[in-house]
Curated annotation (Swiss-Prot):
One of its GO terms (molecular function) is rRNA binding. The keyword Repressor does not apply. The gene is rps19. GO terms for cellular component: cytosolic small ribosomal subunit. Belongs to the universal ribosomal protein uS19 family. This is Small ribosomal subunit protein uS19. The keyword rRNA-binding applies.
């Protein structure tokens, strides 16, 4: 029996660099905990609460605050506009502790970060997460070069 040569680069060893397969890429159907999106959208909220992770389940089972209730009303209004074929306005909210439910998928929501509103398009992959996870409150700090007098070594750096 002939042994296969090992190319050392991983994979099957047949494809060459720069070549792509001719078969069209298929989009895998989205499933959340074994349920498709249409099944999730028809599902009652009580059943959806049972399949989300424990942290979200605890939050949702405790009820909603008045601010969250306002957000739910805005979501229902936007969903009615979508069903009529109109484009809804972006929903602005300060509620970062609200769990993304199946009825919210497809909407655009602006979430307050403490300084500004960050616009987020809710897709299937965001399902069951908190709104606050989608809009980080802290950014990555990129410091510039140190100025004169910042360190002892900068004494010998010529001034521009």
């Amino acid at each position: 029996m002939a042994r296969q040569k090992f190319s050392g680069k991983g994979g099957k060893g047949k494809s060459k660099k720069g070549q792509q397969s001719t078969a069209p890429r298929r989009r895998v159907e989205f499933k959340y905990k074994g349920f498709t999106l249409p099944e999730l959208q028809e599902m009652p909220i009580k059943k959806f609460i049972e399949i989300v992770p424990a942290r979200q389940r605890r939050t949702m089972s405790r009820g909603i605050t008045p601010n969250q209730r306002k957000l739910v009303m805005k979501i229902k209004k936007a969903r009615r506009l979508v069903n009529r074929g109109k484009e809804p306005r972006v929903i602005r909210t300060h509620c970062r502790d609200f769990v993304i439910t199946p009825e919210m998928i497809g909407l655009t929501i602006s979430i307050y970060t403490g300084k500004q509103f960050k616009e987020i398009k809710l897709v299937e992959e965001t399902l069951g997460r908190f709104l606050g996870e989608m809009a980080p409150t802290r950014g990555i700090v990129q410091h510039g070069s140190p100025g004169m007098g910042a360190t002892r070594g900068s004494m010998f750096v010529p001034i521009k």
